[in-house]
Amino acid sequence: MTVRVICDFDGTISERDMIVSIMRHFAPEASEPIIQAVRAGERSVKDGVEAMFALIPSNQYGAVAAYAQAATAVRRGFPQFIHTCEQLGWKVAIVSGGFDFFVEPVIHNLSTASVDIYCNRIDASGSHLRVMWSKPCDEACDGGCGLCKPRVIREIAQPGDRVIAIGDGVTDVKAAKMADFVFARSDLLRLARELGLPHLPFETFDDITAAILDKGSELYAHLS
């Protein structure tokens, strides 16, 4: 049995949702209604993110990347969390609806451990930015994910594996439903409670590491 940890990036590893931060910096007025529609479930993540990046001219891509890399603040305890998982032989995958230009530099700078990264990229060859999804929804998903976290879980988890999901928002709900256990904050915490998913709340990765190291924690009742 392998324990597989599926960890979100925006608002989970990063203190802020970087896509929202980018939009409020580069296209604040036009993007805000889209942000709110996605959060309210009135617009799919895929459709909303594509529409938001299409607001930004391609000649601003360099500035967008530089802003995102400079503005990304990492939630406390993340490097120690990765180290703890590595020591236990747990496999960590960063599965993000975000983009390579800010996800990959942060992860590579913080950890030398073997961490798989699933994220997306931007095509700046046209007049405006275009989203290129690395893992679009498969036939088993009902669609609209953008990067499909359930697809990633189906591809990497083997029969008998245990899956832990870590996240903060509505984009993490489908993965949380597939997981054996969830570490949740913000909107995902509310939804985990409403759905009755086995979970623990967290604010920092120190909280998660403490639960992992406590063999008597609720987590282990769902990993046996």
Residue ranges and their predicted role:
Residues M1-A54:
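Active-site neighborhood of HAD-like aspartate-dependent phosphohydrolases
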Residues G77-H83, Q87-K91, G98-S224:
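C-terminal cap/substrate-recognition subdomain and adjoining C-terminal extension
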Residues I6-D8, V95, I166:
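Short hydrophobic segments within beta-strands
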Residues A30-Q36, Y61-A65, T112-S114:
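Short, surface-exposed acidic
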Residues D47-Q80, L88-W90:
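Metal-dependent phosphoesterase signature
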Residues R16-D17, R43-E50, A66-A70, I153-Q158:
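Short acidic/polar alpha-helix capping motifs at helix-coil junctions
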